[in-house]
Amino acid sequence: MFDLISFIFGDPENKNFLKQAKKTVAKINELEAQYTVLSDADLPAKTGEFKRALAAGTSPEKIVPQAFALVKNAARRLVGREVSVCSIPQKWDMVHFDVQLVAGLALWRNMVAEVSTGEGKTLIATLPAYMNALFGRGCYIATVNEYLAKRDSQWMGALYNMLGLSCAYVYANQSDDDKKRAYAADITYGTSSEFGFDYLRDNSSTSEISDKVQRGFFYCLIDEADSILIDEARTPLIISGEDEDAGANPFSDLLAPIERIVDSQQKLCAQLAEKFRRAERENALTDENFNDLYKIYSCSPRNRQLLQILKNGGVRKRFERLKLNMAADCNKVLAHELKNGMYYAANEKNKTATFTELGQNFFGGSMFLVNDIEADIKSILRDKSMDAPRKNDAVRAKQRQFAESTDRVFALNKLLQAYTLYEKNVDYIVKDGKVEIIDPNTGRVMEGRRWNDYLHQAVEAKERVNIESENTTYATISIQNFFKMFEKIAGMTATAMSEADEFREIYGMKAVRIPPNKPCIRKQLPDLIYLTRREKFNAIIDEIVRAKAVGQPVLAVTASVDDSEVLSRMLKIRHIPHNKLNATNDELEAGIIARAGQMGTVTISTNMAGRGTDIKLGKGVEELGGLLVIGAEHCQSVRVDRQLAGRCARQGDRGAVRFFASFEDTLFRVYADVSFLKDSIKQKHIEGAAFSSSLFPSIIAAAQKKAEDLNFSARKELLKLDAPVNTHRNIVYSMRDNIMSAEKLGYALLPLLDAEIASCVDTNLPANDMDISQDAVSKFCNALFCDYSLSILPMELDGLPKNEIRRKLNEKVAALFEKGPFAKEKGGRGLVLYVLDKAFRDHLSRLEFLREAVYLRAYGQRDPQQEFAQEAYKSWCGLQRTFARSLIALSGRAGIDN
């Protein structure tokens, strides 16, 4: 097999690694043969021997062949033995193939290994996991769902236990004690999100530092690395709670007006569409008619009447040309004028919706006029006819009025977004009275996740379900920055090479393609492209019926829950029994997917349901051509298409895959340029017949590249914007650890408080020590009491230079932290942590708002990322000052109480 490597894999780096791996594999197999003379009881002793050698400074590279050989030998000894996996007894039948050893070596060297589906990634993981566990610093294995974490930890746990290592898994709602024990195991399985949330929870706790459940970040092996490190990386991990400062919910009161404007817009679109059809029937189409189409498109890209009109190839070609013209700088004024003829504009690609001037006037233009709050407050403060209390009341009233106005405008915009760009059963489902988000890549419901920035509340209002309080962010971290905390990370996936650049650029990991154990004989059938979704779905049903007639099993995979429901209904009409998976129960779906290869079985599934589960062919299926996988549309990523194809033809089995597509699919509609084919399509289109053109593969590839580039840019943008937040989070969590572990709380806090005390001294006392009078000291002591509740007598500071005053204040504050509420070990630290956490929460809220608003500065020719970094730094300085002032004030009040 290795002799074919250089022929199959041309990449020099890939080839060089495989050449070296070939020699190491030969050595591993030689050692494994020698280990057959050992008894089962000798294996844990061998593990202990490896641990001692590493602790004594032996090079890990010398241990690797021996360690891998021992793992392979343990797997061989388990063959035929029964292992309980998720309460189901299974006979062990796995011993590492040579290519699995190669993959293990890649993972040991912190690479991303491209391992074809069905090649045994679960068993491969045992090799680097065992080797890294020998260091005694913990080893995490991240999976895509809790079922796989439980299954793999119990399944592979038999192997680890034979070698003398412990293995456990973590899951949501697990008790802290159980979780701590799981993390203390040599090898810990879990989902990436659970690992991340446990990190955030550990650093939000006010209990002892020893109560943290995690024990550090040494090595993490990521199964399905593309899904975790790329797809999930677009959504940061967030722990949130109810916003204590949240005002009244404005959404319910605004539902009626927003529905009126949406209804008015739909009627206007219908009128423009009918006007176009009338001109089309009379062969009198003009530029004005196409401008009307552009108006409809600009406010409602998914408008059904528009999509129906664009089925005419000639019309579509002319319209595509118009869209290109409107994107040019010279036509921006015209494009703006056309959009202003509608009530609002919506951009499907960017998920943005804005009211036009006409739309603002619909509500009464004054609703969108927000006064300059700063100018109003300055005017109040300059008003000599008002005393201080009245000025304070007037300022607060003006601030309330401003907040109510901006909240109302903000809520209107969020409702517009919810009504125009977020579709039920495509972007979300409503289940048990709750709006639940659908992951666009996997088709899974994202349990517990909520859209931020009040969008989720807007969708809840739209669906007339209970509107939950807007939460404030307590702690957050991006997937990228969480995994960057590990000293070593590695990953496996069937599609690593597709994202090799991103793995290298973001995570510093090389990607390497591992050859399959047996040649893949998957049959890639040509795509079938249709004009409409209706024709496409009919063709898919016909294909399923043909396969079902001969007993060939079919797995039809859709991009959304809505599409899976459509296919399911159509199959019921044709009386075709089938299983339907909407990716809501990992364990149930794994069982159904595993049986999808049985003769005559038809399974409808969303993109990633049952991922990580092998589909084994039933008796007689091989002769029928194996499993037929149908893709109901091309995904935005070629990588996800490849994952879908990988459902069949595993381990040398036969199998076939075919994609169906239509010009109404998202990929074609949003990302593909097919305008140059419109004349041909118009002439050749026959209802229900597929188009054939050698250009379609390149059109689809270009569209996917365009979508992938946009998504990659979004992930890079998230990482850049998260950089200052990541720095601030690390500092805050380090501060928390110091506070929780310090012997003397006051003196541990002094470095944090000194800058504020120095600022107070410099602000309230003359610059020259010779100018500090008794009157100045008296006023300074008064300021200390007013600003910080810090009680100190002027006579204590009389005659002292500023640096001595500063030192004395530091000592005074530090001493106060040993009294009153702070004298209680847990209570005092808990109080300080509460103040720090509150300041950090407010900081995160400011940054969240800033992240949404900073891109507006691009219109002023300013770099949004640079602007964000500058504003984030200002907010961080504010956090430090707020924390220090609050602590000094707390210490002052403690002194007064005593």
Predicted regions and their residues:
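Conserved P-loop NTPase motor core
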Residues: M1-E687, S734, P751
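Extended, charged helical/alpha-beta scaffold domains that provide interaction surfaces
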Residues: A411, Y428-I438, T442-R449, Q651, ...
